[in-house]
Every structure is written in structure tokens, then in C-alpha cells.
Design a protein with these regions (language model features):
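Helical "lid/coupling" subdomains associated with nucleotide-phosphate turnover
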Residues: 1-180
Length: 180
């Protein structure tokens, strides 16, 4: 199968090549670019299945799952930026943490609309920040106080209950297939 970062990369490429439309539909072979048709088989429901190998392939359900994740991330970012009167282009840096931040190709995430279009040099991967913080707290008592102070400054926002998030989520479900 495909890992999450591999799925993002593959969908970004297939969007660019015209194998996936704005709605997330994996095109059947007869509608796909001619040079890629040998990788696509019909699924019996009007969609295509893109085969990398006989055992590794991309289905409509895979693309839909990614669209939901993409819409949640992009919608959340939009709401948080809007609440603070910011736009993505004004950010000095964006830090990505955890497995997501460690393995994702930011250019692919921007290509599918999961992350806002910003300069790649402004994106930083921080790795496993939870483990790093727990390790610091276990080793250094002074760090525990520093981390506690940092945690007290954090604000929890339940996005799922916000109308503005629901609207942003819906806006981000589709892929932008317009060329620059």
C-alpha cells in the first residue's frame, strides 16, 4: 500500500498530469492522458484505478480519504489565520511537526491544496516534537517549568463546532486544477 506522504505525492503528480479532476475523480482510461492509460483500469463505477504495480494502486476511495484530510487541514489553517487577521503569505515560517511534518513533501502538500502556497524556504520540519518535549521534561527540571509555561499559553479551539470551519472545509474539498 501507500503511506500518507506517498499518497499526497502520487495525487499531486496525477493532478498535474490530468488523471484526477478537480472533484477528485480518478479518470477512467478513455478520459485519461494517452501515455498513462496503461496504468489505469476501470473500477466498474465510472472511475479509474491507477496501478503503480499489481499490488500497489490508487482507488477513488483513497483519493476521497485524502480530500477529507486535506480539507480538514487546509480549513483549519484558514480559520486560524483568519481569526488572527493573517494571510499565509505574511507568515515568516511554518513549522510542521510529527510524522506529518517529518515525511511530507511540502511542495506536494501545496500542490493538492493541503498547505497554503508559501515559499518552500519558510517551511521547517521539527520532527517528533512530543517525544522531544517529553525527553526534555524528564531530563531537566527547569525545562518542565518552561514547557508548562508554554502549554499555558496554548489555546484549544474545537474547529468541528465552528460554522466558519465547516464552510472552509467545504471550500477545500476540491482540488485546484487551474494552471499558474
Amino acid at each position: 500500500g501507500l503511506c500518507g506522504s506517498g499518497l499526497i505525492d502520487l495525487v499531486a503528480v496525477l493532478l498535474c498530469l490530468g488523471c484526477i479532476d478537480a472533484g477528485g475523480r480518478l479518470l477512467p482510461p478513455e478520459l485519461a492522458p494517452e501515455d498513462l492509460r496503461r496504468h489505469i483500469r476501470p473500477d466498474g463505477q465510472g472511475n479509474g484505478v491507477f496501478y503503480l504495480t499489481e499490488k500497489v494502486y490508487l482507488t477513488a476511495a483513497d483519493v476521497r480519504s485524502l480530500q477529507l484530510a486535506k480539507a480538514a487541514v487546509a480549513g483549519g489553517i484558514e480559520v486560524l489565520l483568519r481569526r488572527h487577521g493573517l494571510s499565509a503569505c505574511r507568515l515568516d515560517r511554518v513549522c510542521l511537526a510529527g510524522g506529518f511534518g517529518n515525511y511530507i513533501d511540502p511542495k506536494s502538500a501545496m500542490a493538492i491544496g493541503m498547505l497554503p502556497e508559501i515559499l518552500p524556504q519558510r517551511l521547517f520540519s521539527l520532527g517528533n516534537t512530543s517525544l522531544a518535549g517529553a525527553s526534555m521534561a524528564a531530563i531537566d527540571p527547569n525545562k518542565r517549568c518552561e514547557l508548562r509555561s508554554c502549554a499555558e499559553k496554548c489555546q484549544y479551539i474545537e474547529l468541528s463546532g465552528l460554522r466558519e470551519f465547516t464552510e472552509a472545509f467545504t471550500d477545500h474539498i476540491t482540488f485546484d486544477t487551474t494552471e499558474d
